[in-house]
């Protein structure tokens, strides 16, 4: 778990959590939070699709805003991956376009989370953690949640 502090009036945490139990542990470790919780998460391609709705439901249970995005889609359709998360989050009570957003471009998803954050909020960037690449159908691409988050914090909250 990495806390990003660029002097912004809200908290940003980057964590590798990508399995249901790991997500639960992240939310348990946070405890009660006074501001909103904004979670950015996606699922890897060629991994167990049955966990996607479960993870969507976990995100919905603990978050005020969930942004579903890409995460190492490999050769699997990112839209298809996102569908599983959305189904779980909707079943748990979230509404697409209201408190549940699909933004498959991970950088844009992080930007949206940072732009949306207000003083006292908590932004969770989940699933990639320390990784320095994102795996797409055409191969690996340089990508770091921490660098992207810092870029948009500096742009919108300095």
Regions found by a protein language model. Name each.
Residues 2-158:
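ATP-dependent carboxylate-amine ligase
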